[in-house]
Amino acid sequence: MTSILVSSFLLATLVLQYATIDAVDYCRLPCRGDNYHVGCREPAYAQECGQSPRTRELLKEHRNEILSKINDVRDHVAKGSWGLPVAARMKVVVWDAELAGLAKRHTKGCVGETLECRNTERLFSPGYLNFKYSGDKLPRIMELIDAAVKKGHLQKHNITREIIESYRDNGPDGNVKELALAISDRVTAVGCGLTTWQDGAKARALLTCNFSSQNIWGRPVYKVGNSPGEKCIEKDETYTNLCSATEPIDPNKSN
């Protein structure tokens, strides 16, 4: 039975890896209220993008850096660091091409927070994080990634055991949204996009990362255990406190 589950998960992972937003009619997917789907947006840049907008390609080295940073934090938290409880079944996060394509489409609007839907045919309620940069000179892509990760990492001072057990966006000392999303055990995949542009004398950038699921208000961020990964079918060799990438976790199922 275990081998069947793992095989099914591997097949689904391959589909996720090679899905593209051009193959799906996102305009037909349901959205809440009057919201519209980011995949239904015109592929051209919005007027908010100023001068010389450019969507940057995230190369393998950039994708690996994002995954490494996220999985480092997940591994650290899963073992009970920062005074947080141990995670029973938190897996290694992998890259998702479809989520990345939707993130790229979102950044072409050059506005961080919107009411756009990001759901796919298989991922019903993706989460997302935005990082906006403004300065005299545009940093290298790696520097933008590191700055975005640092912003989320600083939220370790705000997140508490109580938030892990019953999610909310803010702790006693501030926002926890970015970090809490990165360590959700329902998150199995991530995909990011980056657009840069010139706004007068200022160089600007928007880095958006879509995650396979989002935290639900009042529900656990992750399931707590007595030892790291005690509920994993197989532990990862590199991130030893996490389940392997083949762990069959359903991102659509709430804790």
UniProtKB/Swiss-Prot annotation:
Residues 1-23 form the signal peptide. The keyword Cytoplasm does not apply. A motif (Cell attachment site) lies at residues 32-34. Keywords: Cell adhesion impairing toxin, Hemostasis impairing toxin, Platelet aggregation inhibiting toxin, Secreted, Signal, Toxin. One of its GO terms (cellular component) is extracellular region. Pfam families: CAP. Residues 67-211 form the SCP domain. One of its GO terms (molecular function) is toxin activity. Expressed in salivary glands. It is found in: Secreted. Inhibits platelet aggregation induced by all agonists tested (ADP, arachidonic acid, the thromboxane A2 analog U46619, thrombin, and snake venom snaclecs (TMVA that activates platelet through GPIB, and stejnulxin that specifically acts through GPVI (GP6))). May act by competing with fibrinogen for binding to glycoprotein IIb/IIIa (ITGA2B/ITGB3). Belongs to the CRISP family. This is Tabinhibitin 7. It comes from Tabanus yao (Horsefly).
